[in-house]
Structure formats: structure tokens, C-alpha cells
Amino acid sequence: MTNDIAILKVEGLTVYQGSYLAVRDVSFELLPGTDTAIVGPNGAGKSTLVKAVLDLIPRSSGTIQIFGRPIARLGRLRHLLGYMPQNFIFDRSFPISVSELVGLGWDKEAKKGDLFFSRLWRQDREKSAAVGEALRRTDAYHLQHQAIGTLSGGQLKRVLLAYCLVMPRKLLVLDEAFAGVDVQGAADFYALLNELKRQEGWTVLQVSHDIDMVNRHCDRVLCLNQSIVCTGKPEIALSPQNLLATYGPGFSRYQHQH
């Protein structure tokens, strides 16, 4: 971490879905260069929280700041934010290749006068080179000419992550990004996230069901069940007592591993 300025700051966030209280009075912040996981049972509001933080769904109350600005006023800084949703719904008959999809994440205007971009990447970097490197980093380069409608679930996850990597980001938000990926694939993903965090200064916020992987790889954990049950380093937040308070009786951490 290079400083104590929060990349993301959430205060008093409450979200209703109709008359249902999905998220209640959630506050937390992310410091630069950290990987924070949100864990909790099904229906706990994890995906709802992430969508509200990104201003994708309305919130009932609360404030959200990203890069020190209100989320609604991000403007041109929005390209420094990457998001990989839990479910990517698309028409499988749509004629677009993997490389074309990843290329949609490239913003040629973003690099103009952007010091963050200039420091990490060459100014003369071409879109095709950026797409190729993103696919290599996610072990999906061999899929570049394949139609996205023919991809398996695991392959699509790699391609969507490449879409996020085609531009340098300061904050990467992942919603169950590794669900359905085999053990080796998940390990590869976490190794890549660690590289992005340590070498390039990315900050990661992820929703995950895999308690074991979170315990081994994340810096902080936020246990959620509508409201925050606990938060802290994995060895504290994932204690048996805290997991019981979060998931309820009958919980076994081994049910939440690959």
C-alpha cells in the first residue's frame, strides 16, 4: 500500500428491493493494493451490495466514493474501474469473436494525458497488442478467434477477466468470478490477482463462496448477511465463531470449497 487514501469508501449503504430489505447500513473502505472478499450465505445481499456500490442499482440511503469522488461524478476516471458480473447474459448466436469482445474494453481516449496509464503502459501501445496480452495473462490466447457463443463456462470466465485487463485499472470488482472454475483455474486466477495487486497496484473487491481460497489469498474479509457481521483479516473474520454468526447453524466451511 502506498498511502492511506481509500480507493473505495462506502458509508451507511442500505438497499431495498421492493419491500425487501436486501442490504442494511453497510459501511467499509478499501485501501490501495488490497484484495478484499465479501462472503456470506445465499441471499445475504452480496451481489446486491456490489451492484449498489457500482451504482448499477438504486440505493435507498448511503454514500459511495470511488477514487475520492462520488460514484455519480466519476466521469473519465470510470475507465480505471473494472467489473466482472456473476452472470454474463448474451445471445450465443451473436457473431463476435473472443478478441473482438475483449477489444470492446479498450478505450483509446483514456490514455490521453492519463499519468496512471502512462506510468504502467507504453503510450504507443496498440489495441491488438493490449488484447493479446490480456488474453495471454488469463490463459485464453488460444481462444482469440473463437466465437464467444462456443465457449465453455470456464473459458468465458477467462475471457471476461481478459476484458477487464485490457486496460489498466485501479479497482477491479469481481462477483463470483471463479464460480464453476476448477481448482487449478481458481489458483491461476488468484495468482494473477496477486500479481496485479503487488506489481501494478490494483485494488480488488470480490464476492466469493470459496472460504478456503479467500483465507489463503485475500487481505481482508467482509462477512455479510444483509448487514456486516464482521470484517478484518482472514484469520480473524473467518474464525469458527464468526462463520457461525454469518452462516448460521449447520454451516461447514468445507461445503464452500472447490
Predicted features and spans:
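H-loop (His-switch) and adjacent beta-strand-loop-beta switch element
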Residues: 220-234
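Conserved ABC ATPase "signature" region
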Residues: 103, 115-143
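Helix-to-loop junction immediately C-terminal to a conserved catalytic motif
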Residues: 54
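Conserved ABC ATPase signature
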Residues: 147-151
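H-loop/switch region of ABC-family ATPase nucleotide-binding domains
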Residues: 208-209
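Catalytic Walker B motif of ABC-type/P-loop ATPase nucleotide-binding domains
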Residues: 172-176
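Conserved ABC transporter NBD signature motif
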Residues: 62-79
